Design a protein with these regions (language model features):
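General marker for long, soluble alpha-helical cores
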Residues: 1-85
Length: 85
């Protein structure tokens, strides 16, 4: 599997691999990651995890610091890249 360099590149990862890797993260972290992502990546996350109520979770979280979003993005990239090493 080709390594990804940033969170936006998750859209290029095989869906089965991506879903397995992302399943390790709590819903709140997936929603926070989506807060700093493109509309395309947000659609991908919502499609992969239809059981997450993104709107309700966003209201519950309210505001999040960009540093936290960046930390979650980096952790997701690391997890995806290490998934099949």
């Amino acid at each position: 599997m080709k390594k990804i360099r940033n969170f936006e590149e998750i859209r290029n990862v095989e869906q089965a691999v991506l879903k397995s890797a992302l399943s390790l993260f709590p819903a709140s972290e997936l929603v926070k990651a989506g807060m700093g992502a493109s509309p395309e990546v947000n659609r991908l996350l919502r499609k992969m995890f239809p059981g997450i109520d993104y709107e309700a979770e966003c209201r519950r979280i309210s505001a999040v610091r960009i540093e936290e979003v960046e930390r979650i993005h980096a952790e997701i990239v690391r997890t995806v890249n290490n998934w099949h090493d």
